[in-house]
Amino acid sequence: MDDQQPLQTYNQPPPPLPKHIQLQIQQRQLQLQQQEEQERLQQQQQQQQQQQDQQQHKLEEGSRRRSLSDVVGGVNISNKETPKRAFRIYWANDNHMYWTLLLDSTNTVGDVSEGLKDKVPSSGTQCYLYKRTKANFGRWKDRRLSNEDSVWDIVDRRRKNHKSDPIFVLKRKKSTFSISQKKSPQNESDTSPLSSSGEFLNPYTNPTGSNNIVPSNAGHSRNTSSNSNNSANTSSNNLLAHHQFNNNNNNNNNNNNNNNNNNNNNNNNNNNNNNNNNNNNNNNSNNSSNSNSNNSSNTTTTTTTTTTTTTTSTSTNSINTSNNNNNNNSGSNINPSSFISPMSSLVSLSLSSSPASSAPHSPTLSSQPSSPHTITPITTSPPPPQRNNSSKSLKSTMEMEPPAEYISLLSNNPPPTNGSGSRPPSGSFIPGSIVNGSRSSASDLIGFKPPVCQQQQQQQQQQQQQQQQQVQQQQQQPQQVQQLQQLQQLQQQYQQQQPQQQIQPLSPQQQSQQQQQSPVKQSESIPQSPNLQSITQSSSSNKPLSGSTGMNRSSSPSPFAKKNIGGGGGGGSLADRKNRLSVQPKDIMRLMRFYFGDSLDGTFFTIAVQNDTSAKDVCASVEQKLLLPSGSTFVSLVLPIQPNGSKIERVLGEDEIIIEVKDTWEDPSQTFFQVTHKQQAPNNKRLSRQIQAEPHVIPSEWRRSTDAISLRASSDDMWKRKSIPIFLQVTGPPNTHSHSHSPQRQLPNMSGSPHSHHHHQNNNNNNNNNNNNNNNNDLDDDDSDDESDFDVSTLRGWVHWIPSADLEYIKRIGSGTYSKVYKGKYRDKFVAIKTMRGSNMTTEQIESFKKECDILSTIQSPLLISFYGSCIEESQLSMVVEYCSKGTLHKVLNNPLLDFDWDKWFKWMTEVVEGVRYLHSMNPPMVHRDLKTLNILISSDWTAKLCDFGLTRTMTMTNVSTLGMLRGTMAYTAPEIYDGLLFNTKSDVYSLGVIMWEAIQRCISGVYLRPFHEHPISMDIQIIILTSKNKVRPKISENCPEQLKTLITRCWDENPDKRPNCDEILEILLTMKQAHDENKDEWESIRTKLPKQTIKAVSSSSSNNNNNNNNNNNNNNNNNNNNNNNNNNNNGTNTNSTVNNVVVPSSSNATIVVAPSVSSNSSNINTSMDNKSMSSLSDSPVLPSVGIVSTSSLTGNSNINNNNNNIHDNNNPNNNNSNNSNNTSLDVPPVGVILTRDRRNSIIAVGEVPVIVKPPETPDGTTMVTEVFDFEVPQDSPSLEPLSSNNIISTANILNIGYVNNENNSIIIEGNKSTLNEIGNNNNNNNNNNNNNNNNNNSSNNNSINNNSSNNDENNCINNCINIESNESCIKSNTPEQITLKCVDER
């Protein structure tokens, strides 16, 4: 074994692990990593949850009332890393002044008002913070915020409810009225820091008797005077930086002992059994000038605060002090706005008293009394109010109990206490005050004390000694019994002084009734004794305090605070409620607000309306209040919401009852009454002409104030102006027009066809242009002597400006309340020109005009109307946009001849949705806000395009105010807008649902029905009430496919979040379009097919014109320069003429056109007509060019003159000798009809039997009857229904009877050439006679055309039949009739 060597070990690498084991190891490692990651995420979530809990805890603490412990030295001791948010606080007196504050979650409204108190223009003024939100009808609503509210919570709550952020507004406390406006010079130094804001200062003394001791320290200065006769007003203006304690300038807390010995003993130091006798005999007669007569409403916040009373109870030493200050403060409650000097006779005898002691906010009492007129500044905030559970009399601010009900017993004129359930003392309920509306004298308002004689002083001293003997007994009795005994003693004393007056003790109920029924009489008949008055005053000021800082608010009722039904402190018994309500007469039914003038933010009157109060009574009250002449006002009921932004008002009759008128409306809260002063007629109606002659003389009544706002060169500043001055001349860039612009120059006539802006090269049309201008002058209704235009030439610096010389106005195609729409030309392209005149424009309309131009200039889509620019002229703004000849979708749907099938429905709805999707896809999204069928135009190629972007707004914070306004037609407006929410993209989806419903209803039933047609609606506002409150929607047809019905229902869902967006709608429409293409028969089966209608005849109106138009036509190629053509010389006989052997009734202004064949010289046809005839037909919706309907095989040639537009028949040899040099001979194999766009001219079909003018066909084979009509927006568009006076003449009637009835305004020409020749020969055998004078026959209605005529007449009806513009000289009648198409049912 020894020879064996040990085994040698070699460091060899371990063998590799199998692959499956390696995979398991890797998986395990991954699992461990995932577990670690999950643990780390859980820790992070826990930390975040803890942070959220801490943040929520801070928010909850911030929502509660903040105490003074949260603030040390005025500096917030919270965490510096607390997130802060920026808030903008606006100053209500100046819209351009605001402060931006960084606030955290703990900051409250009280912090904001305190922080901005010294930063307002009038530093030191009491201010309140208000929340301004959007109310109904676009009005603002302000609500005063409580000091405890957290600013973060206010904003977050509104955001959580999907509402807009409020606007925080800081307002100055409104000042109050006073009797005297003079100030006493000796009291100016005693002015309270809060008195300038109109704070009601409390005239009453210590609220809870002697239980509450107000000590003075650095924060509270109580002025005491020992062993002195201070007849002056002792000042103790105690101003707390955080509590804002307001003491009167003449402190009523001076403890007076005027020989009455009315001791209110405070047993505060119970530990040492020492009674701190504070003889607070506040002998304040309350001789104030605050419009208070024994019943003042001013509340002294210092005397009602008990937050510092704990200092006397925490003292370890027993201190017995008796404060007997003989300060007869006869004017102790004088408001600094009006002082009354105390009378010399009011000074009472001085009595000795112990040194006054004050109790500071510390365990030890201050031994240094303050001087009488010292106001100690506050450098640090006082400690928070403390609670002492050992003493019931020491309670915090929020724990004060209401006073006893019978604390004001035996008082002649006591103010109603809170315990009795009556209204707290208020300035609006002061008997005899101005606010109360009484006409009492000054003596009724200010109750002076009677003079104090020596005998009375001796009696007072005797009574004082008797009272001192009863001190020990009174200390053992309850507080209320002591006060009752004191009042009884005072009553006996007062009866001894005035034995002739017998005062009976009154119960609290009787006292309250007596005061409510005759408060002024009591003050006149029985003057109160000083001590009695002081105690009643102290009891009347006893009410709970509110607010986070313990500040006593004004006793005037706040319009933002809710009324306490149960009274100030307790609920009150049934008898108390009856007593409280007995002040209102039984015949008063309701309080209603009547606004005066047009502005809702101005003056209004709240009137107690009775059952029989009429509008005449209201007018009389307002006239008497405002000193207006009798009968110069009227009352109207106003509905403020309308689609065009205007308001609807109904003037009430004098005998109409106000309550009945208010209750007749379904929702009375949506209406309000308005009292309007009747405007007198202007004295000088020719004022505008005077200003044009003497522009430097501007009467004061025509001046519009600019308030020193200077005009700047920048055009953007011009849009920001609140008002545009009328007569302010500002030079702008020079215009390219041939003549210069001036503010006084009136614009040319824009209503008809202002051809002064463009010139024709053809001289043959000069006279026609003048005739058109003269005939269309009646369309312009804007010219008046009183029109005052303002200068907008400074707006020409705008980027979209188009010179007026580049625009050509053709005719007016529409008009509205504030604008007119013309058809015109711009750069050889037909455009629509929307104009706004200065006399109708307001600042909002100008801003809307600019907004629409800005939006149109930024969008580029074939599904939206194209924008070319804007034209700025004197007193006129024009917008140049794309011209759509077919008109609006609303008009197309109302056309009964249109075959509105599913193909059109899918095509137009898809295009509309794509256009809306384009707006919504912009960044930021753009909301149209006024989607309806009237704002969807159909172009000449039958494409739907959106228009009217005046109400369109971007969804940004700058447009929050306008997005909340109720705009658009009510039937298309989403119901949530009525409820105060903002417009968003889902609001447009709601409008799309209504538009699809209209189109489906028209497609299925064949008849257009307006939304909500089944409801009797007299005003548009009722629609929005139906949709929002009653959840009513238009009724969908039963035959509607289920997919479309579901889509429409989703679009107008009540919840905006459940509505689909435009992408979803478009996807659904494309899916349904595929289903329709696959099964058209099934879709067409649900449609109600109307009877097939074909055009059988065309009737024209009979004309009785007696106009002699002498038109001198300049013809360069012919010698017919002086042709006196007397057209339409009708003298009473009816004759018939023939043209090409065709009977033409003379009773109609019919024009027959022999259509030439198409040849290489067809361009001459356009030249032969007016410049604006054939060349303008290219944009006509009637026909692409000249429509020719071949109906016959008649042979013949026709010569068409290039310049004279004469038609010659080659069959007549007498007509081929005058104008052959420049005439082009064309072969005319058929005879046809040229369909014109002018509805006032006739269309006559000539040809074989039967003659039917068929509408043209589209490439897909469908027939569009609407191609025959013009879908512009004319002022007098004819009706599409046939007139009852038009008859249809069949071929049998012509053949059998052999005549044409020419009295029915009907024309039908049927039959072949032979038949027509027979008829023609029977009526006129002299057809081949050469007549050089056209229509020079003594016949009425002789508008027939002889084919032998060689006369050159510019005003011939042949020319006017093919012109775009009709010639008034050819067709003119005193009683014109519309031209209609007669349709016959062929079933």
Curated annotation (Swiss-Prot):
Compositionally biased tracts (Low complexity): 21-54, 221-238, 246-336, 350-379, 501-517, 762-777, 1098-1142, 1197-1223
Subcellular location: Cell membrane
Region (Disordered): 1-76, 175-336, 350-447, 501-578, 729-788, 1077-1142, 1158-1181, 1194-1227, 1319-1348
Enzyme Commission code: 2.7.11.1
Stretches with biased composition (Polar residues): 1-11, 176-220, 387-396, 518-558, 732-754
Residue spans of biased composition, Basic and acidic residues class: 55-68, 1077-1087
Membrane topology qualifier: Lipid-anchor
Region (Binding to PI(4,5)P2): 81-193
UniProt-annotated stretches for the region Interaction with adrm1: 668-775
Keyword Transmembrane: no
Primary location group: membrane
Compositionally biased tracts (Acidic residues): 778-788
Pfam families named among the record's database cross-references: PK_Tyr_Ser-Thr
Family named by the database record: Belongs to the protein kinase superfamily. TKL Ser/Thr protein kinase family.
Its job: Serine/threonine kinase regulating cell substrate adhesion, phagocytosis, motility, chemotaxis, and actin cytoskeleton organization. It is a downstream component of Rap1-regulated adhesion, and it is a regulator of myosin II phosphorylation. It is also a negative regulator of development initiation.
Assembly, per entry: Interacts with adrm1, rap1, rasG and rasS.
Protein name stated in the entry: Serine/threonine-protein kinase phg2
Annotated source species: Dictyostelium discoideum (Social amoeba)
